[in-house]
Amino acid sequence: MAKKNPKILSIVLAGGEGTRLMPLTRDRAKPAVPFGGVYRLIDFPLSNLVNSGYSQVIVLTQYKSHSLDRHISQLWRFSTLLGNYVSPVPAQQRLGKHWYLGSADAVYQTINIIEDVQPDIVVIVGADHVYRMDFEQMVNQHIESGAEFTVAGIRQPIEQSSQFGVIEVDPEHPNMIKSFQEKPKETTGLPDNPNEILASMGNYVANTDALFNALSIDSKAENTKHDMGGDIAPFFAERNEAGVYDFSRNEIPGATTTDHAYWRDVGTIRQFYDAHMDLISYIPEFNLYNMEWPIYTSSGNLPPAKFVHAAGDRIGHATDSIVSPGVIVSGGEIHHSVISPNVRVHSWSQVNDSILFDNVEINRRARVNRAILDKNVVLTENSTVGLDVEHDLARGFTVTSDGITVVPKGTVVDD
C-alpha cells in the first residue's frame, strides 16, 4: 500500500503515431498537433499534471518528435533548483535494438529514470485527449483503496466499446475492477444503463514496486502487445489488485455544469473537428477561459488580432468563433470557426465551420467551408475548399465520410 504524502513521478505517453489523424500527423507527432487556436494537444495533460501539483514529469516521445520536443523545451521551463522539470525522453533502445513496442514497453524502457527518482507512485497519462482533471484526487483514492494499480474511467456509449478499454466494476467493491477488456467487439452495458460502458481514459496510477513487477513479467511474455490497457491493466485486474477512479467525481475549480467532467478522444478527424466545435458556442461544452485551472501554452510575442474595413459588403468580422493573436481579418468574414495565430483573411473571403492552423492565408473571394487547413496553407483568389467533395478529392485532399476536408501543411490551393 502506498504511503500518505507519497513522492510522485508523472509519465506522459507521447509516442503515438496518430495514423487516424493523417494528414495532420504527416509532419508531426500526434501530441504536437495544434488545438483550440493557440494550444497543442500535449498542453492539456501537462497542464493538468502541473495544476495538480505534480511537477516532476517525463514525456516519452518517439514518432516525428522534433516539434513536440521543441514545444516542451520552450514552454515548460521549471526551476531545476527546486527539483521540478518537464523533460522529453526519446526512445533510446535501452533494452534492445527496437523502438517502443507499445505503451507498456515505453514505460519499461524508462525504468532507469524511475529508479533514479525513486517515487512511491507513478502517474501515467496519455497525451492526446482534451480535458481538465485534478490527478491528486485520483491518487488519493488510489491510496485509500489499497489498490496496486488504478484506472480512470468515464461513461461512454456502448456502441463505442471497440474503441476503448472496458471496465467491469466489482459490485461489492465499487472502487475495484472485476474485469478489464481492451477494445472488445462485444460487451454488456452498465447495470444502471445498458446503453453505456465504463471506458478507460488511458490514465493510470500505480505503486512503483507493483508496476515494476508487472512490466518485467510483460517484457518476457510471448502473447502480449506490451500495452498498458491491453496487458498491464488486465494483469492487475486478474489479481484483484486494480482499482477504478470515476472521472465524473473529479472536481475542478471554476468548472461549469456544462463542462464538468468533459473529456474527448480526438484520435480521428471527425473527433478532432467536433472537439473544436465544442469550444465556440456562447456556453461552450469545454471552457478554455477557466483561469482557475489554466491550460498553459505559448503563442509567442504576437500582436492582438485585428479586424479592418467596414464599408458595404466588405466588412472584416467574425461571429461565434475563436480568433487567436496575430490574426488580421481584412474585409473577410469568419463564422463558427477556430482561427490560429497569424492567419490572414482578405476581402470578400468567407470561412465557415472550419479550423485554420497557423499562418494560413485566405486571399480575396476565396471560400472555406467545413474544413481543416494545416499550417501555411494558402488559398489564392477565388479558390475554394470544402464546397465540392469531388473537386477536393481530385486535388488529393483528405475528405472524411461525413464531408470534412483536410488540406495538408504548406499546400497552395489555386483553383
UniProtKB/Swiss-Prot annotation:
Q: Which UniProt keywords apply?
A: ATP-binding, Carbohydrate metabolism, Glycogen biosynthesis, Glycogen metabolism, Nucleotide-binding, Nucleotidyltransferase, Transferase
- This entry's Enzyme Commission designation comes to 2.7.7.27
Tell me what reaction this enzyme catalyses.
alpha-D-glucose 1-phosphate + ATP + H(+) = ADP-alpha-D-glucose + diphosphate
Q: Cross-referenced SUPFAM superfamilies, in alphabetical order?
A: Nucleotide-diphospho-sugar transferases, Trimeric LpxA-like enzymes
One Pfam family here: NTP_transferase
GO molecular-function terms, A-Z: ATP binding; glucose-1-phosphate adenylyltransferase activity
Extract the Gene3D superfamilies matched here. Hexapeptide repeat proteins (2.160.10.10), Spore Coat Polysaccharide Biosynthesis Protein SpsA, Chain A (3.90.550.10)
Pathway(s) per entry: Glycan biosynthesis; glycogen biosynthesis
Q: Does the keyword Kinase apply?
A: no
Oligomeric and partner information = Homotetramer.
Provide the function of this protein: Involved in the biosynthesis of ADP-glucose, a building block required for the elongation reactions to produce glycogen. Catalyzes the reaction between ATP and alpha-D-glucose 1-phosphate (G1P) to produce pyrophosphate and ADP-Glc.
Name the family.
Belongs to the bacterial/plant glucose-1-phosphate adenylyltransferase family.
Task: State what protein this is by name.
Answer: Glucose-1-phosphate adenylyltransferase
